[in-house]
């Protein structure tokens, strides 16, 4: 029995010596005693490959490559330690969560933290660390007691509580596992116990390679190997034997020197012979003298510069991380294409994997570079995992919309042999219905049929259901049954389950009934056929992982009774931890490795990525349960734990050294100057060190395209087709802006255009360079097919065209509309207000009452009755769907009651009486439509509904006025009237005046147009108001109507008989002077002004109608001051209007004063 050290700096050939010795022994005696090559887990695949391809080996039985865990399985299979059930990390974490829930009252700190994301994982890591460093729960308790009883210092009490809680959970976990289960750390303990009984390892030759340090559990295993194996050879990356003592903490080889000393002491304490160390001094790896110089001089002070020029060390400075990875990808393509490199000769070494993971995937896909990322990928994005999560969430949240459709959108609820495209379309339609009707809870699970009506709210009163609606309703219920039935069965089984086994059985039956294995197999076959080999394997892994998770739950917690919500929490915690296992799908691929973790063999070209300050060297990160200060306090008590942040800082130069010297031919070190958000990043001190060491090393400046990197030749950007196409388009864009480009790009363009697989894609991309965001006018026949030969239009439609012709086309030509959502929107509130006022007016007419006769209690009673009758007709009874909406309904009653009271006050003060409410005009309306013959002969009819028409008798004849109810403040802006943006009120006035004889039996004069704001304002006063008359004025003032009145004193007094000379009217926007004339600040217009406005509006209608008939659909939104047509437009995703695009500009309208508008109309000038 002996211990032999094989020592040498990186690249000295330690691994090669091991492989050569193994080869020689295999050739001498193929069936001799076992040879075990023990390496880190992440190195096993590469070592097996290297060993099997060692010249003269071929196949082998005697030698095997193991990690510590795989060796444990091999020994326990032989000696009988595998009878206990193996629990993965996922199972352990589920058990920990259960323990915390059960012992929450006894925990001092952890009870409150259990539900925080990542806490269970951190606690598991802490317990794992305790096991690796041979700390028992009892020892943790003793240390907790020591801190509790010791001097009162900051943090000691907190540390005592932490240790106490860890000990409690740790002890309970061990009690649950002992005798029945094994977790990953138990294998190492059992391996140490079972090595003496293993005939396989007795007198074996052990080679330990690739390790720089060991945990106490691993030292226990090595101790047993030393006792029972013929020879243990340990390879360490170190410059010399440290028999004479430890080097300084800042020494480059401090970490492996520490390991060397501990192994030596272990052998001496067991009376194991220590052979003379073999120290390899020659550099056998590096082919270039510059890399030999780097290996020898790294971390030496003072630095010895390498005087000669070199092509073996390159520095890349990139504008951002994407430019950095694209530059690396271009160089990889060049190496493979021009220098004959294989992808497997190349490695990317990254410390910040989270910052680069997605970038590497995206860029390497574009460049067609095969790669293997040495990092396990979480499963949470897989459809099966999402289905399980969403299905359980559906049950516990009472069928919330989000949970149900997360399950639906996995595609796994669809019938196995169904048409995927058809079912996705059906799911979209079902989702639209669920959103519009507010479907949740019992509406999914009861047997009540879902009803469908195309017409919403008050529009659909007394309209029978059409055949089209009935047909869609039938399909809707079929889709509902097909998709919801499996979830309903799952819910019934989960509700009936009495323990963990019942819950898991319900979930398994749910997946089995959906034929998930068959569906995943189909998905896997499709992925494999498309060449997506990694994805193909992931489908099978996902199914096995979910089944294994349920098995582990049943095994450990199957007999436990617990609430369904708690079961779901535990399963979700398990799902969070599921990861895809890593097996390289091909041999020739770039290795993407982590700087601190990966072990690389036979790499010729290495790219050290992201060499920024704070990354290399690394900052101390405290992301575990134990803070660095607490680890120091434990270390003072002699407690050994994993290296803390301070120790890791000492070790960091060693890992950086390993990364820099791993390539045999060329080293590239890259760093970005900004992150993804544009924040500046500083280069690592390593960059300064390398530039001093290699003053003649080339430094490359890398941008996102050829213009950003003028030093690079154009040929460097011609790589894989997908990436080259991107660069080509950027060059052509520059050419279009009159910049010069390299002639090579025209050759690239011609090559693409002549290639059958790429020409259409490139043509499409090039056409985008000349794209102008405009809309081609419709041909006459298409315009007629869309709008009809006789156009029937509302006034708001005419306004919409004036705001933006394309918005009109999208709304009335394409008939696009927003997805209806089950909530109360502003238009619904406005609709309710209108309907309530009309119902109150109808009730008064039925009871032969007048508005003037209403008292405040009458207003409140009538308003409450009206709102109660109308509410069920608004948005699928949304106002009865929740307590929140019930409260809103009460508030709406108050608004209507306040409005009704104000209207009654207006009636008492006014000589005008309503003669029409919701007065319709059109072919079948109360009044005929307003008809126009357009220039091309097309007839256009204006149709609509007027909120309220009032009449008064004056000395000059009958006066008519229009009142429009608005749920938001509104005034009549003559600038908007002039430009055709606000045509409604004057059009309504024109209609009632045009058809006055039909309406009132004689011609009439315009009294004005007014907006009445329906609201419930808070009255503000600077001091307490006791006077009732004054208070009445304060209450009426916020309801003063806005608009435009006839400039006639008699008409104004008819509108407000209470107005006093010199005072503003509380009802209309007018004031009479003390002399009885109209004040200049009043909003009034003469009869001739009204006539000019009416004529102007009519001319606008003819112009707008003519443009509609001619097929005008231009993207031309208006801009008036700070108002634009795009502000509240729902069609922006369709038109994609963008001022940055060529041809996209606002149609800017100049503001006009009231006087200027009147003057222009009088002169006959049009807007």
From Swiss-Prot:
Q: What Pfam families does UniProt report for this protein, alphabetically?
A: ADDB_N (PF21445), PDDEXK_1 (PF12705), UvrD_C (PF13361)
Sites where the protein binds ATP: 8-15
- Tell me yes or no: is Coiled coil among this UniProt entry's keywords: no
According to the lineage, what is the superkingdom?
Bacteria
Which residues pair up as cystines? none
Q: How is the cofactor bound, as the UniProt entry phrases it?
A: Binds 1 [4Fe-4S] cluster.
Q: Which Gene3D superfamilies match?
A: 6.10.140.1030, P-loop containing nucleotide triphosphate hydrolases
Q: Does the keyword NADP apply?
A: no
Q: Where is the UvrD-like helicase ATP-binding domain?
A: 1-359
Which cofactors does the annotated protein need, by name?
Answer: Mg(2+); [4Fe-4S] cluster
State the UniProt keywords alphabetically.
Answer: 4Fe-4S, ATP-binding, DNA damage, DNA repair, DNA-binding, Exonuclease, Helicase, Hydrolase, Iron, Iron-sulfur, Metal-binding, Nuclease, Nucleotide-binding
Entry GO MF terms: 4 iron, 4 sulfur cluster binding; 5'-3' exonuclease activity; ATP binding; double-stranded DNA binding; helicase activity; metal ion binding
| Binding of [4Fe-4S] cluster, residues | 804, 1126, 1129, 1135
GO terms in the biological process aspect are: double-strand break repair via homologous recombination
Indicate the segments forming the UvrD-like helicase C-terminal domain, all copies: 282-588
Enzyme Commission number, as recorded:
3.1.-.-
Quaternary arrangement and interactors, per the entry? Answer: Heterodimer of AddA and AddB.
- PANTHER family assigned: RECBCD ENZYME SUBUNIT RECC (PTHR30591:SF1)
Q: What does this protein do?
A: The heterodimer acts as both an ATP-dependent DNA helicase and an ATP-dependent, dual-direction single-stranded exonuclease. Recognizes the chi site generating a DNA molecule suitable for the initiation of homologous recombination. The AddB subunit has 5' -> 3' nuclease activity but not helicase activity.
Tell me what else is known: Despite having conserved helicase domains, this subunit does not have helicase activity.
Q: Which family does it belong to?
A: Belongs to the helicase family. AddB/RexB type 1 subfamily.
Q: Tell me the protein's name.
A: ATP-dependent helicase/deoxyribonuclease subunit B
The root-end lineage is: Bacteria, Bacillati, Bacillota, Bacilli, Bacillales
């Amino acid at each position: 029995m002996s211990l032999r050290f094989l020592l040498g700096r990186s690249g000295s050939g330690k691994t090669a010596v091991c492989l050569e010795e193994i080869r020689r022994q295999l050739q001498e005696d193929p069936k001799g005693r076992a040879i075990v090559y023990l390496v880190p887990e992440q190195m096993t695949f590469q070592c097996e490959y290297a060993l099997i391809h060692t010249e003269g080996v071929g196949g082998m039985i005697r030698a095997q490559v193991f990690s510590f865990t795989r060796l444990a399985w091999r020994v326990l299979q032989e000696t009988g330690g595998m009878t206990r059930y193996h629990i993965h990390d996922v199972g352990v974490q589920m058990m920990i969560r259960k323990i915390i829930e059960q012992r929450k009252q006894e925990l001092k700190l952890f009870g409150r933290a259990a539900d925080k994301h990542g806490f269970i994982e951190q606690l598991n890591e802490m317990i794992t660390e305790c096991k690796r460093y041979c700390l028992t729960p009892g020892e943790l308790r003793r240390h907790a007691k020591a801190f509790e009883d010791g001097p009162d210092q900051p943090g000691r009490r907190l540390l005592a509580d932490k240790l106490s809680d860890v000990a409690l959970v740790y002890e309970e976990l061990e009690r649950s596992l002992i005798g029945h289960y094994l977790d990953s750390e138990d294998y190492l303990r059992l391996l140490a116990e079972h090595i003496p009984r293993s005939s396989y390892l007795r007198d074996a030759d052990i080679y330990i390679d690739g390790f720089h340090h060991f945990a106490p559990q691993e030292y226990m295993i090595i101790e047993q190997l030393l006792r029972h194996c013929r020879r243990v050879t340990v390879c360490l990356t170190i410059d010399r034997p440290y028999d004479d003592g430890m080097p300084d903490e800042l020494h480059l080889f401090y970490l492996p020197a520490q390991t060397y000393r501990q192994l030596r002491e272990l052998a001496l304490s067991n009376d194991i012979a220590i052979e003379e160390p073999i120290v390899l001094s020659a550099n056998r790896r590096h082919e270039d003298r510059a890399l030999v110089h780097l290996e020898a001089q790294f971390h030496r002070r003072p630095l010895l510069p390498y005087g000669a020029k070199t092509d073996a060390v390159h520095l890349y400075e990139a504008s951002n991380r994407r430019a950095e990875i694209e530059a690396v990808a271009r160089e990889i393509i060049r190496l493979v294409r021009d220098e004959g490199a294989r992808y497997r000769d190349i490695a990317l070494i990254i410390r910040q994997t989270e910052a680069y993971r997605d970038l590497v995937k995206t860029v390497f896909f574009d460049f067609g570079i095969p790669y293997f990322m040495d990092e396990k990928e979480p499963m949470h994005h897989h459809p099966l995992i999402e289905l399980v999560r969403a299905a359980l969430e559906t049950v516990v949240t009472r069928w919330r919309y989000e949970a149900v459709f997360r399950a639906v959108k996995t595609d796994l609820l669809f019938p196995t042999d169904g048409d995927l495209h058809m079912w996705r379309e059906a799911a979209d339609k079902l989702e639209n219905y669920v959103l519009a009707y507010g479907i949740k809870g019992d509406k999914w699970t009861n047997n009540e049929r879902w009803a469908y009506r195309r017409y919403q709210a008050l529009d659909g009163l007394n309209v029978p259901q059409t055949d089209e609606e009935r047909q869609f309703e039938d399909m809707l219920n079929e889709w509902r049954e097909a998709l919801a039935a499996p979830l309903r069965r799952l819910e019934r089984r989960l509700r009936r389950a009495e323990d963990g086994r019942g819950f898991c059985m319900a979930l398994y039956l749910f997946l089995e009934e959906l034929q998930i294995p068959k569906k995943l197999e189909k998905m896997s076959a499709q992925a494999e056929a498309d060449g997506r080999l990694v994805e193909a394997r992931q489908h099978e892994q996902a199914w096995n992982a979910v089944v294994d998770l349920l098995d582990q739950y049943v095994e450990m917690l199957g007999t436990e009774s617990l609430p369904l919500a708690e079961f779901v929490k535990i399963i979700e915690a398990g799902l969070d931890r599921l990861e895809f296992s890593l097996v390289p799908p091909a041999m020739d691929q770039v290795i993407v490795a982590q700087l601190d973790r990966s072990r690389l063999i036979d790499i010729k070209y290495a790219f050290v990525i992201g060499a920024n300050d704070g990354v290399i060297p690394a900052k101390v990160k405290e992301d575990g349960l134990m803070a660095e200060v607490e680890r120091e306090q434990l270390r003072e008590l002699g407690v050994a734990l994993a290296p803390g942040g301070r120790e890791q800082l000492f070790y960091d130069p060693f890992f950086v050294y390993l990364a820099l010297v791993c390539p045999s031919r060329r080293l590239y070190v890259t760093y970005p100057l900004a992150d993804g958000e544009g924040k500046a990043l500083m280069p690592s001190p390593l960059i300064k060190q390398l530039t001093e060491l290699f003053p003649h090393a080339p430094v490359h400046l890398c941008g996102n395209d050829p213009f950003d990197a003028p030093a690079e030749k154009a040929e460097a950007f011609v790589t894989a087709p997908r990436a080259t196409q991107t660069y080509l388009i950027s060059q052509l864009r520059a050419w279009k802006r009159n910049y010069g480009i390299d002639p090579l790009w025209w050759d690239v363009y011609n090559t693409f255009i002549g290639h059958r697989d790429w020409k259409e894609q490139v043509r499409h991309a090039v056409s985008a360079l000349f794209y102008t965001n405009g809309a081609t006018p419709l041909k006459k026949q298409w315009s007629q097919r869309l709008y009809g030969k006789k156009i029937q239009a509302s006034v708001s439609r005419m306004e919409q065209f004036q705001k933006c012709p394309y918005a009109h086309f999208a709304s009335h030509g394409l008939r696009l509309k927003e997805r209806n959502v089950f909530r109360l929107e502003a238009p619904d509130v406005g609709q309710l207000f209108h309907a309530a006022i009309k119902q109150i007016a109808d009730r008064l007419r039925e009871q032969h009452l007048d508005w003037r006769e209403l008292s405040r209690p009458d207003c409140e009673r009538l308003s409450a009755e009206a709102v109660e009758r109308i509410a069920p007709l608004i948005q699928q009874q949304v106002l009865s769907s929740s307590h929140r909406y019930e409260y809103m309904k009460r508030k709406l009653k108050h608004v209507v009651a306040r409005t009704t009271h104000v209207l009654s006050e207006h009636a008492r003060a006014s000589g005008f009486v309503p003669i029409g409410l919701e007065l319709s005009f059109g072919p079948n309306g109360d009044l005929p439509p307003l008809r126009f013959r357009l220039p091309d002969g097309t007839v256009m009819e204006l149709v609509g509904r007027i909120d309220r028409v009032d009449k008064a008798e004056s000395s000059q004849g009958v006066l008519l006025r229009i009142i429009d109810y608005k749920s938001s403040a509104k005034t009549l802006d003559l600038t908007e009237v002039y430009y055709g943006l606000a045509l409604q009120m004057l059009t309504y006035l024109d209609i009632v005046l045009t058809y006055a004889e039909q309406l009132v039996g004689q011609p009439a004069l315009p009294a004005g147009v007014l907006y009445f704001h329906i609201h419930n304002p808070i009255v503000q006063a600077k001091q307490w108001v006791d006077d009732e008359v004054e208070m009445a004025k304060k209450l009426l003032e916020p309801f003063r109507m806005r608009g435009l009145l006839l400039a006639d004193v008699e008409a104004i007094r008819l509108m407000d008989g209470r107005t006093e000379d010199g005072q503003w009217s509380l009802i209309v926007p007018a004031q009479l002077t003390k002399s009885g004339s109209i004040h200049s600040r009043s909003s009034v217009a003469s009869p001739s002004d009204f006539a000019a406005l009416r004529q102007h509006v009519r001319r606008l209608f003819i112009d707008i109608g003519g443009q509609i008939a001619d097929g005008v659909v231009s993207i031309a939104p208006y801009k008036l001051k700070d108002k634009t047509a795009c502000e509240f437009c729902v069609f922006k995703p369709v038109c994609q209007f963008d001022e940055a695009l060529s041809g996209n500009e606002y149609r800017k309208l100049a503001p006009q004063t009231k006087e200027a508008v009147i003057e222009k109309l009088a002169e006959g000038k049009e807007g």
